[in-house]
Regions:
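Bacterial N-terminal signal peptides
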Residues: 26-37
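Right-handed parallel beta-helix
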Residues: 100-245
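Acidic Gly/Asp/Thr-rich repetitive segments characteristic of extracellular carbohydrate-active
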Residues: 46-91
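Residues in short coils/turns that link rungs of repeat/solenoid architectures in beta-rich domains
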Residues: 148, 181, 219, 252-253, ...
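Active-site/pore-lining binding-face segments in mid-to-C-terminal subdomains
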Residues: 266, 277-397
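C-terminal functional modules
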Residues: 341, 347-460
Length: 460
């Protein structure tokens, strides 16, 4: 593929005008309405194509440029050191390769930061044997791969690691990243269930205004090192998290939580491709034992233009959205596709518990981010496979394998990274960072050749 096309994939929202034009004639009048009301021009986006309630976060805009100059787990010049600095900052990379965290989670606690993985020389940056907790506000992270894996821990031990989790964070966008081989969730939004005395205070006290866009969220490890053993999970959106947008992601080979909303969550799920879930794709569950005597809150979910396709690990029967627990869910679903391995339709709604919970279908979205452009569901599979994940212009072998298996209906849920080749071991590469090559306000490249690639034309 020419680099000019690769650059357009990177800097633009592929749904764009094409989605608006096609929805103008679509029979789904409700979907057409969802594409209206663009953001005011006065609010600059974090980067072109940014979406969701975190779309206008400044991240590290205007702050100091911090260069990652080595692949060490910590110390001067490391990624961890850059993330622990105070004040607005843009983290760029003068090295490419693997950072071995040695089971020491990175905890990002200082706000106003942009992590620009697109600046790294090929093959980009991959974190292994650990993950990242984002416990700050106004964070943009793009084009990073995180693969925790078993990290040498014993089966059923205490090694339950998310690739990325937000912890009471807000105004956070995780965009075009690859998150695989977690032993807990691959990508989650979390925090305390109840902070304060009212539902509004609960929501402000946990993660809110979070966007997960254009990521590969795949191969959560099953019978692995988590103390509960089976724990192949995609995304957990924890109780009372709100203003959550999950957009344009690939969920592949995760047993459950593709994604899962817990009690009282308010979020939007649009144009995602869910392939080969084990026993659940989307699900909602308010667990009465966790809420105790606290009044249950209705969850709110809007799901539009998503695709679910069963694979070799899928347990049938399976529904697109499954309900468990005891809390009710306000649900708006339109133009979603759910099929088995030979293209036969699967049910849209189901349940996996006998509690009193209800799915209350609504005529209008209970929650929506105005300005979101929606692609028709029958175009989503190709679009997601082309655009999701870190560095689409410079795929690494593991991403290529996941994408190819998804396209061809292959692959499975795995228990260890060793089943698919183990941790990557590329040689370290170097390239000086030149600020004149980048629009520093958005960390977009000024020219196609700025995006370093040794894989152009290799395809998937």
């Amino acid at each position: 593929m020419p680099k000019e096309q690769l650059l357009m994939m990177f800097v633009s929202n592929p749904a764009g005008a094409r989605a608006r034009r096609r929805h103008r004639y679509a029979p789904l009048a409700a979907v057409l309405l969802l594409t209206a009301h663009p953001l005011p021009a006065a609010e600059p986006l974090a980067f072109p194509g940014a979406v969701g309630w975190a779309a206008t976060t400044p991240g590290g805009r205007g702050g100091q440029i911090l260069k990652v100059t080595n692949l060490d787990a910590d110390g001067p010049g490391s990624l961890r050191a850059a993330l622990t600095e105070e004040g607005p900052r843009i983290v760029v990379f003068e090295v490419g390769g693997v950072i071995d965290l040695d089971r020491k989670t990175i905890r990002l606690e200082q706000p106003f930061v942009t992590v620009a993985g697109q600046t790294a020389p090929s093959p980009g940056i991959t974190l292994i044997r650990g993950g990242m907790d984002i416990a700050a506000h106004d964070v943009v992270m793009q084009h990073i791969r995180i693969r925790p894996g078993e990290a040498g821990a014993a089966k059923g031990s205490d090694w339950g690691e998310d690739a990325v989790s937000t912890a009471s964070a807000y105004n956070v966008t995780v965009d075009h990243c690859t998150l695989t081989w977690a032993t807990d969730e691959n990508l989650s939004a979390s925090g305390p269930r109840f902070t304060g005395d009212s539902p509004d205070e609960w929501r402000s006290g946990t993660s809110h205004s979070i966007t997960f866009s254009h990521n590969i969220i795949a191969e959560g490890l099953g019978d692995s090192t988590h103390p509960k053993f089976e724990h192949s999970k995609g995304s957990l959106i924890h109780d009372n998290a709100s203003r959550i947008l999950i957009y344009g992601n690939l969920y592949a080979h995760n047993y459950e939580r593709n994604p899962m909303f817990k009690g009282g969550v308010q979020g939007v799920i649009v144009n995602n491709f869910i392939y080969d879930p084990g026993q659940r794709a989307l699900h909602y569950n308010l667990m009465a034992l966790e809420w105790g005597d606290v009044p249950f809150q209705e969850g709110e979910m809007t799901a539009v233009g998503n695709v679910l396709r069963a694979g070799p690990s899928t347990e049938l029967p399976l529904a697109f959205l499954m309900l468990g627990g005891h809390g009710d869910l306000l649900y708006y679903g339109r133009d979603n596709i759910a099929v088995d391995r030979i293209g036969e339709p699967l049910p849209m709604l189901g349940r996996y518990a006998t509690g009193k919970a209800r799915i209350i279908e609504t005529d209008e979205p209970p929650v929506w981010w105005e300005g979101l452009e929606v692609l028709p569901a029958n175009e989503v599979e190709t679009w997601v496979l082309k655009n999701a994940g870190a560095r689409p212009w410079d795929r690494d072998p593991q991403d290529i394998r996941v994408l190819a298996d998804t396209a061809e209906g292959r692959g499975k849920i795995i228990d260890s990274e060793e089943e698919v080749g183990g941790y990557p071991q590329p040689e370290m590469t170097h390239r000086p960072f030149n600020p004149e090559d980048w629009y520093l306000e958005t960390m977009m490249p000024k020219r196609p050749e700025v995006l370093d690639s040794r894989a152009a034309g290799r395809g998937t």
